[in-house]
Amino acid sequence: MVTRSVRIPGAADGQARLSPRADFAAVALLAEHRAAQPALMLRTLGHACLALYRCGETPLLITDPWLVGSVYWRSWWLQNYPTPEEVDWLANSARVYITHEHPDHFHMPSIRRLGSGPEYLFPALAEQGYLAYKVRHGYRAEAVPPSRWQAIGEAVSILSIPLWNDDSMLLIDTPSALILNLNDAKPPPPVLGSIRHMADRIGKPRILLCSYSPASCINSFLDEAGIVSLKPARHYVDYVCRVCDTLAADFYLPFASQAVFERRDSCWANGYRTSYDDLRRYWQSNAGLLPPYTTLDLADFTHHSIAPEQYRPMERSRVVALTGRRVADEEAAALSAEDVAGLERKLNAFRWFLWLFFPRGFAFQLGERRLGYDARRGRLEESNSSNRGDFVVVIPKLTMKEAVRNNHVSELGISMFVRIRLLRRFDPRKVYALFALLQVDDYGHLESRAALLRWVGRGIRYTFALRLPVPPR
């Protein structure tokens, strides 16, 4: 494959040399290879974007490009935006892999900025509407065959693993290292075991990238005493450490957690983010902890990183203007009978489960309107009671309208401005389960018996019967 020679933008301060915990024969053989080719580099940008490239060349591959703007109804913004020159460089990538549909990974404004030049690769999930969407809009797109190595350059291959939760992982084999991009997939133990078995057979240093901060409604609960936090920052650090040690990772790159929350109704969540300082404070893994926004030489494992004082956040005046405009639009919106009926249909897909979980029912506070859901009757209707049901989900009206009409109601729990007021003592994890159930319907797994069986079958196959080959030599 021929790549263009370019200047790599975005030099970062600080440099250090790292050593894998073990002496790998594969690394010793690399010196001869490097004499013939420029060094292979790994760089993290944006939120969950990695770029794999050779020095002086355009990327062989990038992933999950959220590079401009915001996501989740103007709530999430990047800590550090790439420069226009860096985005131009990324737009020349040969391939773009999208792990899953969440907008902080499948971000259409960023993809439009990158253009139709790259080939867009997607996991072979049970439902693949995103693939048809890309093709329909003039992009080159295809699904990557699961659990099969695919060459993308000289001595560089990728392997995609689809998961039951409509997410995927991407493994990248290079001459001197194995890159394990778990993003925020949270693979179950059997999948981690299969990856570990394959990685042991390959025998190269391992670089793990995965999220380390909450991206759900886990801290969105309120009772009469204030915020009910289900998991502290240390929980997320301990999880990453366990994954690192389970996979015998040599290095960990903080990843897929580089967002801040800027709406006036979501900024509270910044106090519950897991930060890089938390990672350093609680780190107990044998893997080497690297900073966010790092460029890593895959031959000798030297690296440099962008210091926090050099981050490029969005201009403050622009954030204030855009979030203010969104909040004004929320307040001006009105729910229609069609919107209410659509939400009722969505809930009734799980009517009997919800009756078991919440026999007293629950409610939605949508601006000035409160709608109570009675699972036994399967009805969502106006409620004048302030204490009816187990909990109240507080959601801005326009956001609810858009979530129902776009069939992505489960994403409300990720927004950080949706709050859940507990009206009585019960396990808040049941509400978390509600959003997980809604995702099953959002992604089309209940459209037909065939769709449900396809999803369940693939989930079983790629969890309990997963067999990963080593890359061809």
Where are the model-predicted features located?
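Catalytic core of the metallo-beta-lactamase
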Residues: 45-57, 145-146, 150-203
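Pre-active-site segment of Zn-dependent metallo-hydrolases
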Residues: 33, 55-101, 108-113, 187-204, ...
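Active-site neighborhood of phospho(di)ester-bond hydrolases with catalytic His/Asp-centered motifs
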Residues: 62-64, 92-106, 121-125, 180-185, ...
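Metallo-beta-lactamase
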Residues: 8-10, 14-37, 117-177, 281
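Zn-dependent metallo-beta-lactamase
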Residues: 1-82
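Active-site-proximal loop/helix segment associated with metal-binding centers of metalloenzymes
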Residues: 65-66, 75, 161-176, 185, ...
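Cap/insert and terminal regions of metallo-dependent hydrolase folds
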Residues: 190-285
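Feature captures hydrophobic
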Residues: 297-473
